[in-house]
UniProtKB/Swiss-Prot annotation:
HAMAP family in the cross-refs: UPF0761
Main location: membrane
Cystine connections: none
Protein name listed in UniProt: UPF0761 membrane protein XCC0860
Species, as recorded: Xanthomonas campestris pv. campestris (strain ATCC 33913 / DSM 3586 / NCPPB 528 / LMG 568 / P 25)
Amino acid sequence: MSRVNTMHQWKERLRDRARTASFGRFLWRRFLDDRLFQAAASLAYTTVFALVPLAIVVFGVLSAFPAFNEWKDALTDFIFNNFVPGAARSVQNYLNRSLEDLGKFTVAGMVALVASLLITLHSIEQTFNSIWRVAAARPKVTRFLIYWTVLTLGTMLAAASMAMAAYVFALPLFRTTEGQWLAEFAWRLAPMAVEFVCIVLIYRVVPQHAVRLRHALPGALLAVILMEIVKWGFGFYLGNFQTYQRIYGALSALPILLLWIYLSWVSVLLGASLASSMSAFRYQPEAMRLPPGFEIYGLLRLLGRFRQARLHGNGLDEDRILALEPMLTDTLMQELLCELKRIRLLRRDERGNWLLARDLDVVPLAELYESCQLRVPVEDRPLPCRDDPYGQAAAAALEQLRQPLRSVLAQPVGDLYTHLPGDPP
Protein backbone atom coordinates (compact mmCIF):
# COMPACT_ATOMS: atom_id res chain seq x y z
CA MET A 1 0.00 0.00 0.00
CA SER A 2 1.45 3.36 -1.02
CA ARG A 3 1.86 6.27 1.38
CA VAL A 4 -0.75 8.26 -0.54
CA ASN A 5 -3.31 5.49 -0.12
CA THR A 6 -2.44 5.13 3.56
CA MET A 7 -2.88 8.87 4.19
CA HIS A 8 -6.17 8.86 2.29
CA GLN A 9 -7.34 5.89 4.36
CA TRP A 10 -6.55 7.67 7.62
CA LYS A 11 -8.34 10.83 6.45
CA GLU A 12 -11.45 8.81 5.61
CA ARG A 13 -11.33 7.15 9.01
CA LEU A 14 -11.09 10.50 10.77
CA ARG A 15 -14.17 11.68 8.91
CA ASP A 16 -16.09 8.65 10.16
CA ARG A 17 -17.45 9.98 13.45
CA ALA A 18 -18.53 6.57 14.71
CA ARG A 19 -15.08 5.13 14.08
CA THR A 20 -13.34 8.13 15.67
CA ALA A 21 -15.57 8.05 18.75
CA SER A 22 -15.07 4.30 19.07
CA PHE A 23 -11.29 4.71 18.87
CA GLY A 24 -11.39 7.48 21.50
CA ARG A 25 -13.28 5.23 23.92
CA PHE A 26 -10.95 2.34 23.15
CA LEU A 27 -7.86 4.51 23.71
CA TRP A 28 -9.17 5.81 27.04
CA ARG A 29 -9.92 2.27 28.25
CA ARG A 30 -6.39 1.19 27.29
CA PHE A 31 -4.92 4.14 29.18
CA LEU A 32 -6.82 3.11 32.30
CA ASP A 33 -6.15 -0.62 31.94
CA ASP A 34 -2.42 -0.12 31.40
CA ARG A 35 -2.05 1.83 34.69
CA LEU A 36 0.73 3.81 33.08
CA PHE A 37 1.28 6.25 35.92
CA GLN A 38 1.97 3.42 38.38
CA ALA A 39 4.24 1.73 35.86
CA ALA A 40 6.13 4.99 35.25
CA ALA A 41 6.67 5.43 38.99
CA SER A 42 8.13 1.94 39.28
CA LEU A 43 10.40 2.47 36.28
CA ALA A 44 11.55 5.85 37.61
CA TYR A 45 12.85 4.32 40.85
CA THR A 46 14.62 1.43 39.11
CA THR A 47 16.08 3.82 36.51
CA VAL A 48 17.66 5.98 39.22
CA PHE A 49 19.47 2.95 40.63
CA ALA A 50 20.55 1.88 37.14
CA LEU A 51 22.13 5.21 36.13
CA VAL A 52 25.63 4.29 37.29
CA PRO A 53 25.76 0.79 35.74
CA LEU A 54 24.21 2.17 32.56
CA ALA A 55 26.91 4.85 32.37
CA ILE A 56 29.58 2.21 33.01
CA VAL A 57 28.32 0.09 30.11
CA VAL A 58 27.92 3.05 27.74
CA PHE A 59 31.31 4.60 28.37
CA GLY A 60 32.95 1.21 28.68
CA VAL A 61 31.81 0.48 25.14
CA LEU A 62 33.23 3.79 23.93
CA SER A 63 36.52 3.13 25.72
CA ALA A 64 36.87 -0.16 23.84
CA PHE A 65 37.08 1.80 20.58
CA PRO A 66 39.92 4.37 20.60
CA ALA A 67 38.28 6.26 17.72
CA PHE A 68 35.38 7.17 20.03
CA ASN A 69 37.44 8.16 23.06
CA GLU A 70 37.49 11.83 22.16
CA TRP A 71 33.70 11.86 21.88
CA LYS A 72 32.95 10.60 25.39
CA ASP A 73 32.95 14.04 26.98
CA ALA A 74 31.07 15.55 24.03
CA LEU A 75 28.40 12.84 24.26
CA THR A 76 28.06 13.35 28.02
CA ASP A 77 27.71 17.12 27.65
CA PHE A 78 25.19 16.71 24.83
CA ILE A 79 23.01 14.39 26.94
CA PHE A 80 23.06 16.52 30.09
CA ASN A 81 22.73 19.84 28.27
CA ASN A 82 19.71 18.74 26.24
CA PHE A 83 17.90 16.04 28.21
CA VAL A 84 18.51 16.72 31.91
CA PRO A 85 17.12 19.71 33.88
CA GLY A 86 19.77 22.24 34.85
CA ALA A 87 18.97 21.86 38.55
CA ALA A 88 19.87 18.16 38.34
CA ARG A 89 23.10 18.78 36.43
CA SER A 90 25.15 17.94 39.53
CA VAL A 91 24.34 14.29 38.83
CA GLN A 92 26.82 14.52 35.95
CA ASN A 93 29.66 15.14 38.39
CA TYR A 94 28.55 12.19 40.49
CA LEU A 95 28.54 9.89 37.46
CA ASN A 96 31.97 11.12 36.42
CA ARG A 97 33.36 10.38 39.88
CA SER A 98 31.78 6.93 39.82
CA LEU A 99 33.41 6.17 36.48
CA GLU A 100 36.79 7.37 37.76
CA ASP A 101 36.47 5.12 40.83
CA LEU A 102 35.39 2.11 38.79
CA GLY A 103 38.65 0.30 39.49
CA LYS A 104 37.97 0.49 43.24
CA PHE A 105 34.68 -1.42 42.99
CA THR A 106 34.64 -4.86 44.60
CA VAL A 107 33.25 -7.92 42.87
CA ALA A 108 30.13 -7.73 45.02
CA GLY A 109 29.69 -4.08 44.06
CA MET A 110 30.00 -4.83 40.36
CA VAL A 111 27.50 -7.70 40.68
CA ALA A 112 25.05 -5.35 42.41
CA LEU A 113 25.45 -2.73 39.66
CA VAL A 114 24.94 -5.25 36.87
CA ALA A 115 21.95 -6.75 38.69
CA SER A 116 20.30 -3.33 39.07
CA LEU A 117 20.80 -2.67 35.34
CA LEU A 118 19.33 -6.04 34.35
CA ILE A 119 16.37 -5.54 36.70
CA THR A 120 15.68 -2.16 35.12
CA LEU A 121 15.87 -3.52 31.58
CA HIS A 122 13.66 -6.46 32.54
CA SER A 123 11.10 -4.11 34.12
CA ILE A 124 11.07 -1.99 30.97
CA GLU A 125 10.47 -5.03 28.78
CA GLN A 126 7.71 -6.30 31.08
CA THR A 127 5.98 -2.92 31.00
CA PHE A 128 6.07 -2.72 27.20
CA ASN A 129 4.89 -6.33 26.88
CA SER A 130 2.00 -5.48 29.18
CA ILE A 131 1.08 -2.45 27.05
CA TRP A 132 1.09 -4.59 23.90
CA ARG A 133 -0.78 -7.40 25.72
CA VAL A 134 2.04 -9.91 25.27
CA ALA A 135 1.65 -12.86 27.61
CA ALA A 136 4.93 -14.69 26.95
CA ALA A 137 8.29 -12.92 27.21
CA ARG A 138 11.35 -13.74 25.14
CA PRO A 139 13.69 -16.54 26.21
CA LYS A 140 16.33 -15.35 28.67
CA VAL A 141 19.26 -15.75 26.28
CA THR A 142 17.47 -13.86 23.52
CA ARG A 143 16.48 -11.17 25.98
CA PHE A 144 20.07 -10.68 27.17
CA LEU A 145 21.38 -10.50 23.59
CA ILE A 146 18.81 -7.82 22.74
CA TYR A 147 19.73 -5.81 25.84
CA TRP A 148 23.42 -5.98 25.02
CA THR A 149 22.88 -5.16 21.35
CA VAL A 150 20.74 -2.12 22.14
CA LEU A 151 23.24 -0.76 24.67
CA THR A 152 26.39 -1.33 22.61
CA LEU A 153 25.15 -0.50 19.13
CA GLY A 154 23.07 2.41 20.43
CA THR A 155 26.11 3.89 22.13
CA MET A 156 28.34 3.51 19.07
CA LEU A 157 25.67 4.92 16.76
CA ALA A 158 25.24 7.95 19.03
CA ALA A 159 28.97 8.66 19.08
CA ALA A 160 29.30 8.04 15.34
CA SER A 161 26.37 10.37 14.66
CA MET A 162 28.00 13.16 16.66
CA ALA A 163 31.30 12.64 14.85
CA MET A 164 29.55 12.71 11.48
CA ALA A 165 27.59 15.84 12.42
CA ALA A 166 30.76 17.60 13.55
CA TYR A 167 32.46 16.68 10.27
CA VAL A 168 29.53 17.88 8.16
CA PHE A 169 29.15 21.17 10.02
CA ALA A 170 32.90 21.82 9.63
CA LEU A 171 32.56 21.96 5.84
CA PRO A 172 33.08 25.37 4.15
CA LEU A 173 29.38 25.48 3.34
CA PHE A 174 28.55 26.06 7.02
CA ARG A 175 31.12 28.82 7.55
CA THR A 176 28.93 31.41 5.87
CA THR A 177 26.33 33.40 7.79
CA GLU A 178 23.48 31.37 6.33
CA GLY A 179 25.38 28.13 6.92
CA GLN A 180 26.02 29.00 10.56
CA TRP A 181 22.34 29.76 11.04
CA LEU A 182 21.45 26.41 9.47
CA ALA A 183 23.98 24.57 11.64
CA GLU A 184 22.65 26.25 14.78
CA PHE A 185 19.09 25.34 13.81
CA ALA A 186 20.14 21.73 13.19
CA TRP A 187 21.82 21.48 16.60
CA ARG A 188 18.66 22.87 18.22
CA LEU A 189 16.56 20.30 16.39
CA ALA A 190 18.98 17.44 17.09
CA PRO A 191 17.74 16.58 20.63
CA MET A 192 14.15 16.17 19.43
CA ALA A 193 15.30 14.13 16.44
CA VAL A 194 17.37 11.91 18.73
CA GLU A 195 14.41 11.46 21.09
CA PHE A 196 12.10 10.62 18.20
CA VAL A 197 14.41 8.04 16.61
CA CYS A 198 15.27 6.40 19.93
CA ILE A 199 11.63 6.11 20.99
CA VAL A 200 10.62 4.65 17.62
CA LEU A 201 13.38 2.04 17.97
CA ILE A 202 12.29 1.28 21.54
CA TYR A 203 8.70 0.70 20.44
CA ARG A 204 9.86 -1.53 17.60
CA VAL A 205 12.50 -3.57 19.46
CA VAL A 206 11.59 -3.89 23.13
CA PRO A 207 8.12 -5.51 23.14
CA GLN A 208 7.75 -9.13 22.08
CA HIS A 209 5.33 -7.98 19.42
CA ALA A 210 5.59 -6.99 15.77
CA VAL A 211 5.00 -3.22 16.00
CA ARG A 212 4.45 -1.58 12.64
CA LEU A 213 6.30 1.60 11.78
CA ARG A 214 3.06 3.42 10.94
CA HIS A 215 1.90 2.80 14.53
CA ALA A 216 5.25 3.49 16.21
CA LEU A 217 5.68 6.87 14.50
CA PRO A 218 2.54 8.60 15.92
CA GLY A 219 3.25 7.13 19.35
CA ALA A 220 6.83 8.42 19.27
CA LEU A 221 5.61 11.82 18.07
CA LEU A 222 3.23 12.06 21.03
CA ALA A 223 6.01 11.00 23.42
CA VAL A 224 8.43 13.61 22.05
CA ILE A 225 5.80 16.37 22.28
CA LEU A 226 5.04 15.43 25.89
CA MET A 227 8.75 15.27 26.76
CA GLU A 228 9.33 18.71 25.28
CA ILE A 229 6.41 20.04 27.32
CA VAL A 230 7.94 18.43 30.42
CA LYS A 231 11.33 20.05 29.71
CA TRP A 232 9.72 23.44 29.12
CA GLY A 233 7.66 23.10 32.29
CA PHE A 234 10.72 22.16 34.31
CA GLY A 235 12.67 25.09 32.94
CA PHE A 236 9.84 27.51 33.67
CA TYR A 237 9.17 26.22 37.18
CA LEU A 238 12.78 25.92 38.29
CA GLY A 239 13.62 29.28 36.76
CA ASN A 240 10.83 31.14 38.57
CA PHE A 241 10.37 29.18 41.79
CA GLN A 242 13.09 28.08 44.18
CA THR A 243 10.96 25.87 46.44
CA TYR A 244 12.93 22.69 45.84
CA GLN A 245 16.26 24.36 46.51
CA ARG A 246 14.97 25.93 49.73
CA ILE A 247 13.48 22.69 51.06
CA TYR A 248 16.14 20.19 50.02
CA GLY A 249 19.19 22.42 49.78
CA ALA A 250 22.18 20.56 48.36
CA LEU A 251 20.03 17.44 47.93
CA SER A 252 17.53 19.17 45.62
CA ALA A 253 19.08 17.50 42.55
CA LEU A 254 17.78 14.08 43.62
CA PRO A 255 14.01 14.79 43.79
CA ILE A 256 14.25 16.94 40.66
CA LEU A 257 16.01 14.14 38.79
CA LEU A 258 13.53 11.56 40.06
CA LEU A 259 10.52 13.69 39.06
CA TRP A 260 12.04 14.37 35.64
CA ILE A 261 12.66 10.65 35.04
CA TYR A 262 9.10 9.86 36.17
CA LEU A 263 7.50 12.40 33.82
CA SER A 264 9.76 11.25 30.99
CA TRP A 265 8.60 7.67 31.50
CA VAL A 266 4.99 8.85 31.60
CA SER A 267 5.53 10.50 28.21
CA VAL A 268 7.18 7.41 26.70
CA LEU A 269 4.53 5.04 28.07
CA LEU A 270 1.63 7.23 26.92
CA GLY A 271 3.14 7.20 23.43
CA ALA A 272 3.52 3.43 23.67
CA SER A 273 -0.11 3.08 24.71
CA LEU A 274 -1.17 5.15 21.70
CA ALA A 275 0.94 2.99 19.36
CA SER A 276 -0.45 -0.17 20.94
CA SER A 277 -4.02 1.13 20.69
CA MET A 278 -3.58 1.99 17.02
CA SER A 279 -2.35 -1.53 16.27
CA ALA A 280 -5.00 -3.23 18.40
CA PHE A 281 -8.03 -1.12 17.49
CA ARG A 282 -10.38 -2.56 14.92
CA TYR A 283 -13.62 -0.78 14.25
CA GLN A 284 -16.45 -3.29 14.33
CA PRO A 285 -20.01 -2.42 13.34
CA GLU A 286 -22.65 -3.66 15.73
CA ALA A 287 -23.50 -6.65 13.52
CA MET A 288 -19.86 -7.79 13.50
CA ARG A 289 -19.30 -7.83 17.28
CA LEU A 290 -19.26 -10.99 19.34
CA PRO A 291 -21.90 -10.86 22.09
CA PRO A 292 -20.42 -11.00 25.60
CA GLY A 293 -19.85 -14.59 26.68
CA PHE A 294 -19.69 -16.01 23.15
CA GLU A 295 -15.89 -16.15 22.98
CA ILE A 296 -16.13 -19.92 22.53
CA TYR A 297 -17.80 -19.29 19.17
CA GLY A 298 -14.78 -17.27 18.07
CA LEU A 299 -12.45 -20.00 19.36
CA LEU A 300 -14.18 -22.72 17.35
CA ARG A 301 -14.10 -20.58 14.22
CA LEU A 302 -10.41 -19.87 14.79
CA LEU A 303 -9.56 -23.56 15.08
CA GLY A 304 -11.49 -24.20 11.87
CA ARG A 305 -9.30 -21.66 10.11
CA PHE A 306 -6.15 -23.35 11.39
CA ARG A 307 -7.44 -26.75 10.28
CA GLN A 308 -8.06 -25.42 6.78
CA ALA A 309 -4.63 -23.78 6.67
CA ARG A 310 -2.99 -27.04 7.73
CA LEU A 311 -4.69 -28.93 4.92
CA HIS A 312 -2.99 -26.55 2.49
CA GLY A 313 0.36 -26.74 4.31
CA ASN A 314 0.20 -23.11 5.46
CA GLY A 315 0.28 -21.16 8.69
CA LEU A 316 -1.56 -18.00 9.66
CA ASP A 317 -0.06 -14.73 10.81
CA GLU A 318 -1.98 -12.43 13.12
CA ASP A 319 -2.93 -9.96 10.41
CA ARG A 320 -4.37 -12.77 8.32
CA ILE A 321 -6.33 -14.11 11.30
CA LEU A 322 -7.92 -10.71 11.92
CA ALA A 323 -8.76 -10.40 8.23
CA LEU A 324 -10.42 -13.84 8.18
CA GLU A 325 -12.23 -13.39 11.50
CA PRO A 326 -13.37 -9.75 11.71
CA MET A 327 -15.41 -10.41 14.86
CA LEU A 328 -12.21 -11.03 16.86
CA THR A 329 -10.60 -8.08 18.57
CA ASP A 330 -6.82 -7.97 18.79
CA THR A 331 -6.99 -8.52 22.55
CA LEU A 332 -9.28 -11.55 22.27
CA MET A 333 -7.15 -13.01 19.48
CA GLN A 334 -3.99 -12.65 21.59
CA GLU A 335 -5.69 -14.31 24.56
CA LEU A 336 -6.92 -17.25 22.49
CA LEU A 337 -3.58 -17.75 20.76
CA CYS A 338 -1.70 -17.68 24.06
CA GLU A 339 -4.06 -20.22 25.62
CA LEU A 340 -3.82 -22.54 22.62
CA LYS A 341 -0.05 -22.23 22.70
CA ARG A 342 -0.01 -22.98 26.43
CA ILE A 343 -1.81 -26.29 25.90
CA ARG A 344 0.50 -26.98 22.94
CA LEU A 345 -2.25 -26.95 20.39
CA LEU A 346 -0.55 -24.16 18.43
CA ARG A 347 3.07 -23.24 17.82
CA ARG A 348 4.95 -20.54 15.91
CA ASP A 349 7.35 -21.15 13.05
CA GLU A 350 10.56 -19.24 12.35
CA ARG A 351 8.63 -16.58 10.39
CA GLY A 352 6.24 -15.90 13.25
CA ASN A 353 3.25 -17.66 11.67
CA TRP A 354 0.95 -19.75 13.84
CA LEU A 355 0.56 -23.47 13.04
CA LEU A 356 -1.44 -26.36 14.44
CA ALA A 357 0.87 -28.46 16.60
CA ARG A 358 -1.56 -31.35 17.13
CA ASP A 359 -4.17 -33.16 15.12
CA LEU A 360 -7.63 -31.81 15.97
CA ASP A 361 -9.11 -35.28 15.40
CA VAL A 362 -7.50 -36.48 18.65
CA VAL A 363 -8.14 -33.35 20.74
CA PRO A 364 -11.28 -33.73 22.90
CA LEU A 365 -13.58 -30.75 23.18
CA ALA A 366 -13.37 -31.10 26.97
CA GLU A 367 -9.69 -30.14 26.85
CA LEU A 368 -10.54 -26.86 25.15
CA TYR A 369 -13.37 -26.20 27.58
CA GLU A 370 -11.26 -26.85 30.68
CA SER A 371 -8.06 -25.15 29.57
CA CYS A 372 -9.51 -22.01 27.97
CA GLN A 373 -12.18 -21.63 30.70
CA LEU A 374 -14.76 -20.20 28.34
CA ARG A 375 -18.42 -20.26 29.32
CA VAL A 376 -21.07 -22.03 27.28
CA PRO A 377 -23.86 -19.46 26.77
CA VAL A 378 -27.36 -20.84 27.16
CA GLU A 379 -29.27 -18.02 25.47
CA ASP A 380 -29.43 -17.68 21.71
CA ARG A 381 -28.03 -14.45 20.27
CA PRO A 382 -27.34 -13.22 16.73
CA LEU A 383 -23.79 -14.20 15.84
CA PRO A 384 -21.59 -12.61 13.16
CA CYS A 385 -20.76 -14.70 10.07
CA ARG A 386 -23.06 -17.46 11.26
CA ASP A 387 -24.06 -18.54 7.77
CA ASP A 388 -20.60 -19.34 6.40
CA PRO A 389 -19.22 -22.91 6.78
CA TYR A 390 -17.12 -22.04 9.83
CA GLY A 391 -20.03 -20.25 11.49
CA GLN A 392 -22.39 -23.15 10.83
CA ALA A 393 -19.93 -25.67 12.28
CA ALA A 394 -19.21 -23.53 15.35
CA ALA A 395 -22.90 -22.74 15.96
CA ALA A 396 -23.85 -26.42 15.63
CA ALA A 397 -21.19 -27.44 18.16
CA LEU A 398 -22.31 -24.68 20.50
CA GLU A 399 -25.93 -25.83 20.24
CA GLN A 400 -24.95 -29.40 21.15
CA LEU A 401 -23.11 -28.14 24.22
CA ARG A 402 -25.89 -25.96 25.59
CA GLN A 403 -28.93 -28.17 24.89
CA PRO A 404 -28.42 -30.37 27.99
CA LEU A 405 -27.76 -27.27 30.09
CA ARG A 406 -31.07 -25.64 29.23
CA SER A 407 -33.22 -28.29 30.89
CA VAL A 408 -30.98 -28.44 33.96
CA LEU A 409 -30.81 -24.67 34.36
CA ALA A 410 -34.57 -24.28 33.88
CA GLN A 411 -35.37 -25.91 37.24
CA PRO A 412 -35.88 -23.68 40.32
CA VAL A 413 -32.94 -23.30 42.67
CA GLY A 414 -35.08 -24.42 45.58
CA ASP A 415 -35.51 -27.86 44.01
CA LEU A 416 -31.84 -28.52 44.67
CA TYR A 417 -32.47 -28.61 48.43
CA THR A 418 -35.71 -30.62 48.67
CA HIS A 419 -33.99 -33.72 50.08
CA LEU A 420 -31.74 -32.11 52.67
CA PRO A 421 -31.90 -33.76 56.14
CA GLY A 422 -33.96 -31.86 58.69
CA ASP A 423 -36.41 -30.40 56.18
CA PRO A 424 -40.09 -30.74 57.15
CA PRO A 425 -41.96 -33.46 55.24
